[in-house]
Regions:
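Bacterial Sec-dependent N-terminal signal peptides
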Residues: 1-25
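Domain-level marker for long, solvent-exposed, non-transmembrane regions
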Residues: 20-157
């Protein structure tokens, strides 16, 4: 009986670090809607991670656009348009070349990100063993992004 308890205890101890790491990964893409402007754009609070501060900022912008396009906003104030722009089940794979180019470093996704709502000193920065994290407030130009996806025949309506 003692050996079973010892084995169970060692197993629990061995699995604890992986559970902590899995939780950290989930929080890496936390995106909250702060509000919707009269022009239909969405103000989001988003986190990005990278090997340096510039990479973390760019990743935060990519995360925000990706979430608006594919995942939809899960958290935030009422009144935010929570639905993703692309609702087709296999769109990521079907239009893989298009989205690889669109989300490339310095790609067209930046045309639909505005830093107008970013206030000086409002960004949260942190450095850890992996790299930098950067939390910032940005605006996604959702109507223009939707028009682009329609023009490129990615979405209908």
């Amino acid at each position: 009986m003692r050996t079973w308890i010892s084995i169970l205890f060692m197993l629990v101890i061995a699995l604890m670090p992986s559970a902590i790491k899995a939780q950290a990964v989930v929080n890496r893409t936390s995106i909250k809607c702060m509000g919707v402007e009269l022009d239909g754009s969405q103000t989001l609070r988003v986190i990005g991670y990278g090997k340096n501060r510039a990479d973390a900022k760019e990743q935060a912008m990519k995360n925000a656009v990706w979430t608006v396009v594919f995942d939809g906003i899960r958290e935030g104030v009422a009144g935010c348009n929570m639905r993703p722009l692309v609702t087709e089940a296999n769109a990521r794979e079907r239009y893989e070349d298009y989205f690889n180019t669109f989300f490339a470093d310095g790609g067209d996704y930046k045309k639909y990100v505005s830093l107008r709502d970013t206030k000086k000193g409002s960004a949260a920065r942190a450095k850890d063993k992996v790299g930098y994290s950067y939390e910032m407030t940005i605006r996604i130009l959702r109507p223009q992004l939707k028009a682009r996806l329609k023009a490129d025949n990615i979405i209908s309506n």
